[in-house]
């Protein structure tokens, strides 16, 4: 996965950029 290292709050993977996934544990993309 190619994920920009930008901390974005998320509630689902679609909130994240590129190939990021939403890390439900901390509520941020990663």
Curated annotation (Swiss-Prot):
The domain comment in this protein's record states: The presence of a 'disulfide through disulfide knot' structurally defines this protein as a knottin.
Task: Say yes or no: keyword Secreted present.
Answer: yes
Keyword list, A-Z: Disulfide bond, Knottin, Protease inhibitor, Secreted, Serine protease inhibitor
Q: Does the keyword Secreted apply?
A: yes
Q: Which family does it belong to?
A: Belongs to the protease inhibitor I7 (squash-type serine protease inhibitor) family.
This chain belongs to the protein called Trypsin inhibitor 2
Coiled-coil annotation: which residues?
none
């Amino acid at each position: 996965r190619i994920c920009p290292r930008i901390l974005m709050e998320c509630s689902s993977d679609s909130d994240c950029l590129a190939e990021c996934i939403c890390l439900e544990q901390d509520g941020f993309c990663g």
